[in-house]
Amino acid sequence: MNKRLLRSLLSLMVCMAMLLSLTPAVLAESADAPSTEMAVGAVIHGFEVVENGEFALLNAKTTVLRHQKTGATVFFLINEDTNRAFDISFVTPLSDDKGIPHVFEHSTLDGSKKYPSASLFFNLIYQTYNTYMNAATYQVMTTYPVASLSEAQLRKYADFYLDSCFNPMIYEDESLFRSEAWRYSLESADSPLTISGTVYSEMQGAASLETSASYNAMKAAFPGSHMGYNQGGEPTEIPSMTWQEVKDYHTAYYHPSNSLTTVYGAIDDPAAFLALLDEAFSPYEAKAFDFSTPDYTPVTSPVEKVCQYPVYEGTETENAAVTYITFICENATEEEQNVLDLLTMLLSDSSSALVSNLVDVLPNADISVYLETDGPEPAVVFVATGMNEGDVQTLRECIYASVLEFAENGVSQDILDAIASSLTMETALMSEESDLGVNMAQNIAYCWATTGDVHAYEKTIANMDNFEKYQTEGKYAEVAKKYLTEDNQRVITVTTVPAPGQQEAIEADLAAKLAETKAAMSAEEIDQLVADTAAL
């Protein structure tokens, strides 16, 4: 998984067990064990119980079930949290920057066969007892979480989500695609032609040098793989998307065999949820999914490149670049990846030698480090902001020297204690949040999407207990020397710099193309587009 994405919540969970003992009513000491009907081997509404267990940090009893017909996985986490949550997630890989999974995520909740109303989703959000209702597209998955203080309401919302995911209205209604993705707009016959669309506009607003730098770095580190594509969609690419592509994408990936359903909280009648799921899944046959990356071409020698990000003339460019230095950790074992994950947290700590040394040589720069495991190979990624293009060699030398210093001296007990204290404080703040079930469901789904293991998130949390163990055993120094020194030739350095004046050029080019498109329209086409624009 992308550890930078999940780290904040993972860190919050380290001291969860201690906090749960302080949390009244909502999370009591322990949930009742699943009923005998959830015994391993039992079949309930077409689902076979595969295993029962515990998620100690949530005081939850867990049950994993497999749908006999499709192989779909369902994960129950039953405790006494009355803010119950339901989530269904799908692995949705990327092959371009059009943002197809993002558009489908939006259109999914625009109505379905059973619930044919484009406005129903927004009405449901404001219902009594509902505490959360949304959908989100990530680099590797699309997820549909909902939460409620009423179990009966949660089942109704689950039914709405299931029908929306599997029987969306977008198959029959192209206007939903035009509304959510992109469309030509014309206010009047004399107005300039423009492009509109919910996702198109959203991604224009979301564009930034920092996010572009991340995509640039991952494309260079993992060429030919799904890494580095913008899951939300690049505004320059979204208008090349077609309605048929969105429908084909749904057909390819929105299948029970490619799903994980998580049900969390004080669930009195799990069988009722299984009945809903069986009804939604049964029209499908089991299907095998292959998410390998046959076009991936591994980098075998050092790579360095500079990418430009368009900004307006006059934009401040001093200390505005972002540099990614990615170390491919070839054939790193699962244990080595666990060590690297915690090592990156130690290197990122404000008291670390890396941070201290960087202040001395590049006082305007900030650095963070994370373990990337979403790609075809694990990698440790150093991200420096507040950079200039000419600072790259200084940054690289600082990283190498600091890693060697760390390998020689290890980490002080003071830093270990400081990290533990910080995690305790963050966990205390988390206890005040209301969406624990939703957050847990999404993180479980994300880890499952990248590993195929429904317990991967639990294992990542458990690894947090190994901070001092790895130090005592010399594991940090071992992996640091093996993967993060100049001996590793598989290092990719990508700096993204602002390019003043390019944004004006892009906008002028788009305006010229739109003017050309309008000039080619007939009078009847223009009148129809004006009417369509008014209707939308």
Regions found by a protein language model. Give the residues of each.
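Bacterial N-terminal signal peptides that target proteins for export
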Residues: M1-M13
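Helicase-associated low-complexity regulatory tails and linkers flanking the ATPase motor
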Residues: K3, A60-T63, S292-P294
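Bacterial N-terminal signal peptides
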Residues: S11-S21
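Sec-dependent signal peptide cleavage junction
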Residues: L19-A33
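Charge-rich, well-structured scaffold segments of protease-associated domains
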Residues: P34-A42, S107, G111-P298, N319-T323, ...
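N- or domain-start disorder-to-order transition segments that initiate the globular core
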Residues: T36-D81
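Short acidic-hydrophobic surface loop/beta-edge motif
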Residues: K61-K69, V303-G314
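Active/ligand-binding-proximal structured segments within catalytic/core domains
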Residues: I78-L120, L124, E334-L347
